[in-house]
Amino acid sequence: MGGAVSAGEDNDDLIDNLKEAQYIRTERVEQAFRAIDRGDYYLEGYRDNAYKDLAWKHGNIHLSAPCIYSEVMEALKLQPGLSFLNLGSGTGYLSTMVGLILGPFGINHGIELHSDVVEYAKEKLESFIKNSDSFDKFEFCEPAFVVGNCLQIASDSHQYDRIYCGAGVQKDHENYMKILLKVGGILVMPIEDQLTQIMRTGQNTWESKNILAVSFAPLVQPSKNDNGKPDSVGLPPCAVRNLQDLARIYIRRTLRNFINDEMQAKGIPQRAPPKRKRKRVKQRINTYVFVGNQLIPQPLDSEEDEKMEEDKEEEEKEPGEALKPEEPPQNLLREKIMKLPLPESLKAYLTYFREK
C-alpha cells in the first residue's frame, strides 16, 4: 500500500519527497524537519518503518504520518519568540521541531495523557540535546512536558500564540480549545474529520480554514474524582531565563555568527549541497483513514501504479561523480568554545555538557 509520498531511504530522503509533493513548502519548516531524525523517535526494531509516510503506534507511543506533521507545521506559521502549546504531545517529535523555530525566547509546552509517554519524550529530548549533530546549528526552545488530560487544563492558565491538538476534537469542545488561544494566534486541530486552521482575529471573532481530510482517534474524556468533578491540570510556568542562561545563549550566538562570517569570507557554503536522488512520479493524496493502528492515505496505489513508479526511478549522477567515504561532521561551534580562555566547567556548560 502506498503513502501520500514515496518512502525514503533516510530522513533527508523522506524530506525531499515531502517537498516534491508540496507538503513542506517553506525553508524554515524544511530545516526543522531535516534537523530532527524521525527514526530517532522509533523503538529499536521498528526504525525501518520510520521513513515511510505512515503513522506508527506501539502501546501508548504514537507518531502521525510525516505528511500530517508537515501540514501542521506549515499551518502553524511559526516565528521565533512565540508561545506554543501541544495538546497530546506524545513522543515530543513535533515539539522538538517547533523548538528549533521558536528559538531561546519562545515558550514550548506540551501536555500528554500517558505518564510513560512523557518519560519517553523526555528521554528523546535529552538524547537530542546531548547527541544530535543538529543541536549546535540552532537556537533552541526546549519543550516542557506535563502529564494530564488536555480537557482538564486549569481555567486560569495562560494563553498561547500557537496551539496544536493531535487528537480528534468534538464540536462541543471547540470553544474550550479556542479560549486557550491569544488574539492573533493560530490553532490547528482535527475537527469533524478535517484538519482545521483557526485564527483568532479578535476577542470574539475567528477565521477557519480546512487543510486536509483526516480521521483521528478522539480525545479521551476526563475521569472524575470523588467529588464528581475532574481534577484540573496545571501547565508549565512561563519562566524567565536567568542571567547565566542568557549569557550562554549570547556567547553561543556570537560565536555562531563569527563562524558564519568566517565561512562567508572564505567562500565556503554554509549548507551542504542537496543530495542527488531518484526521480519519482507520485500524486498528492488528501484523504486519510485509520486501518488498525495505521493512518493510511486513500486512495491506495494499485500494483500497476507501483510498478510504473519503480520503472520511472532513475539515479541522477553528476558527470564524473565518484563515491567518497563520508567524513565525520565538523562541529565548529564546539571547537570555538573549547578554545575560549575559560575553566573547563564553564566550557562544559556552554556546550550543554555535550561530548561531541
Swiss-Prot record:
Compositional bias of kind Basic and acidic residues: 319-331
Assembly and binders: Component of the probable ECS(PCMTD1) E3 ubiquitin-protein ligase complex, at least composed of CUL5, ELOB, ELOC, RBX2 and PCMTD1. Interacts (via the BC-box) with ELOB and ELOC; the interaction is direct and stabilizes PCMTD1.
Role according to the record: Substrate recognition component of an ECS (Elongin BC-CUL5-SOCS-box protein) E3 ubiquitin ligase complex which mediates the ubiquitination and subsequent proteasomal degradation of target proteins. Specifically binds to the methyltransferase cofactor S-adenosylmethionine (AdoMet) via the N-terminal AdoMet binding motif, but does not display methyltransferase activity. May provide an alternate maintenance pathway for modified proteins by acting as a damage-specific E3 ubiquitin ligase adaptor protein.
GO cellular component, one term: Cul5-RING ubiquitin ligase complex
Biased composition (Acidic residues): 301-318
Organism superkingdom: Eukaryota
Active-site residues, record numbering mapped to chain: 64
PANTHER family named in the record: PROTEIN-L-ISOASPARTATE O-METHYLTRANSFERASE, PROTEIN-L-ISOASPARTATE O-METHYLTRANSFERASE DOMAIN-CONTAINING PROTEIN 1
Similarity-based family: Belongs to the methyltransferase superfamily. L-isoaspartyl/D-aspartyl protein methyltransferase family.
Any one of the GO BP annotations: protein ubiquitination
Keyword Plastid attributed: no
Keyword tags: Cytoplasm, Lipoprotein, Membrane, Myristate
Subcellular location: Cytoplasm; Membrane
Topology relative to the membrane: Lipid-anchor
Region ranges (CUL-box): 340-343
Location of the region described as Disordered in the Swiss-Prot/TrEMBL record: 299-331
Lipidation (N-myristoyl glycine): 2
GO molecular function, one term: protein-L-isoaspartate (D-aspartate) O-methyltransferase activity
Region BC-box, annotated ranges: 240-250
Name of this chain's protein: Protein-L-isoaspartate O-methyltransferase domain-containing protein 1
Signal peptide start-end: none
Chief localization: cytoplasm
Record remark on domains: At its N-terminus, contains L-isoaspartate and S-adenosylmethionine (AdoMet) binding motifs. Also contains an extended SOCS box motif, where the Cul-box is separated from the BC-box by ~90 residues, within its C-terminus.
